[in-house]
Amino acid sequence: MVSSSVSSVTEVKVESYVFPPSVKPPSSTKSFLLGGAGVRGLEINGNFVKFTAIGVYLEESGVAVLSGKWKGKTAEELSDSVEFFTDIITGPFEKFTQVTLILPVTGQQYSPKVAENCAAQWKAAGIYTDADGIAIEKFLQVFQTESFTPGDSILFTHSPESLTISFGKNGAIPEVSNAVIENKKLSEAVIESIIGEKGVSPAAKKSLATRIAEILNHFDA
């Protein structure tokens, strides 16, 4: 049962930030379990500079969805499988990502990079539409006047057809979201940018594979 697998979920500490085993996203009545968490950083002049700590949560029903194909696989098998992460990204259940700032950033610094990556990916695949352009503009507008200090969080709820955006201050998760953008591709592209084949946080991907393998081993349909 899902409840037995949920009871095995533990918190994860990334740098000085703790991601609890379960959370209730803004404007949601559901609890999501912590799939995994890790740092996002870049090598700059020979030093690994850490920018954010990222936690990836799954709606509890996602455990049952993933179990059919992935239960019994090792953490290494999941970590090496592009298909496994794609099944999380595109699965018919909600995901919640918490991007907590280690270094300060403004909304105008953060959002264009995400938007440009999404648009470039869609255009390369030949699937970019006018509706996608409108969704990108809405995404940029949500961040326009925002500024984030260490400990603040950018929060995304990835529903099958929409992306909900929220902002948390000083480690808190707000009860109400800031915006909902009705665009399936954007919802998937944002989480894909984190845990997809070219995801920005290999540490979060490794944590996700390790923990989901363990959660599925405790899951009984």
Curated annotation (Swiss-Prot):
Could you tell me what reaction this enzyme catalyses?
A: a chalcone = a flavanone
Q: What class of enzyme is it?
A: isomerase
Q: Which UniProt keywords apply?
A: Flavonoid biosynthesis, Isomerase
Mention one GO molecular function: chalcone isomerase activity
Q: Which residues form the signal peptide?
A: none
Q: Which InterPro entries match?
A: CFI (IPR044164), Chalcone_isomerase (IPR016087), Chalcone_isomerase_3-sand (IPR016088), Chalcone_isomerase_bundle_sf (IPR016089), Chalcone_isomerase_sf (IPR036298)
Annotated site (Important for catalytic activity), which positions? Y110
Q: List the EC numbers from the record.
A: 5.5.1.6
Query: Which positions bind substrate?
Result: T52, N117, S193
On tissue specificity, the annotation reads: Flowers.
GO biological process terms, alphabetically, are: flavonoid biosynthetic process
The record's section on PANTHER family has:
CHALCONE--FLAVANONE ISOMERASE 1-RELATED, CHALCONE--FLAVONONE ISOMERASE 1-RELATED
What task does this protein carry out?
Catalyzes the intramolecular cyclization of bicyclic chalcones into tricyclic (S)-flavanones. Responsible for the isomerization of 4,2',4',6'-tetrahydroxychalcone (also termed chalcone) into naringenin.
- Similarity comment text for this entry: Belongs to the chalcone isomerase family.
Miscellaneous note of the record: Part of the biosynthetic pathway for all classes of flavonoids, a large class of secondary plant metabolites, many of which are brightly colored.
* Protein name listed in UniProt: Chalcone--flavanone isomerase
Supply the source organism for this entry. Gentiana triflora (Clustered gentian)
- What lineage is this protein's organism placed in? Eukaryota, Viridiplantae, Streptophyta, Embryophyta, Tracheophyta
